[in-house]
């Protein structure tokens, strides 16, 4: 008689795979002809890359530059109260946005996260199977740079997937509720 498998209960670092796969579309998930989607964000958070100094940010941009030629600075994001700082100066390490020419795709990077964003501008939402590989490509570029620099590999602590929808008033809702309720007065 086989012993029953013990269920996994992943903690902050255990049970998380560095491989994310495409969802199974055969399970009956809805698919809209014109989804109200405004933005999709794929992301990973990882243990801070301790030896990733400012010059390495430029080397990472070289990997992204042909597809994302524009760079923007953004305030660092924190998970909790910890902010990554430069060991020598104590200054916060930046979060950079590597943005494509049409401004509808960007890769966000800081020493403890990597995000890929698709944003609605002129084009319709190209769908998950078309944009997920772009996130994977950004992740692969980061991982290859870490190998080239003889740095430790990323240790993923969280995966993120965010869909941001824009649903205009009158198209599915009419009155904003000011409190939790089942009907609005």
Tell me what each language-model feature is.
Residues 10-19, 27-29, 95-102, 106, ...:
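Aromatic/basic-lined ligand-recognition segments
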Residues 128-134, 150, 176-178:
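"Short basic amphipathic alpha-helical interaction patches in structured regions
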Residues 52, 56, 60, 127-134, ...:
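Short amphipathic alpha-helical segments
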Residues 36-44, 106-125, 153-166:
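Glycine-rich, often proline-containing surface loops adjacent to acidic residues and nearby aromatics
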Residues 71-128:
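Long, hydrophobic/aromatic-enriched structural stretches that serve as scaffold segments
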Residues 11-81:
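N-terminal ordered "arm"
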Residues 133-155:
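Secondary-structure boundary elements
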């Amino acid at each position: 008689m086989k012993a029953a498998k013990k269920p996994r209960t992943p903690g902050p670092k255990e049970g998380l795979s560095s491989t994310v796969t495409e969802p199974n579309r055969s399970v009956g998930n809805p698919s809209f002809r014109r989804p109200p989607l405004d933005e999709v964000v794929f992301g990973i958070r990882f243990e801070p890359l301790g030896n990733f100094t400012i010059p390495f940010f430029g080397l990472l941009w070289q990997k992204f530059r042909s597809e994302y030629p524009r760079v923007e600075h953004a305030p660092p994001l924190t998970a909790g109260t910890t902010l990554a700082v430069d060991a020598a100066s104590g200054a916060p390490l930046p979060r950079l946005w590597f943005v494509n020419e049409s401004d509808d795709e960007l890769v966000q990077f800081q020493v403890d996260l990597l995000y890929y964003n698709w944003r609605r501008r002129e084009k319709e939402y190209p769908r998950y199977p078309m944009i997920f590989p772009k996130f994977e490509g950004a992740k692969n570029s980061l991982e290859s740079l870490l190998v080239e620099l003889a740095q430790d590999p990323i240790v993923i602590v969280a995966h993120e997937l965010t869909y941001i929808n824009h649903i205009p008033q009158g198209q599915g809702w009419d009155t904003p509720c000011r409190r939790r309720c089942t009907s609005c007065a």
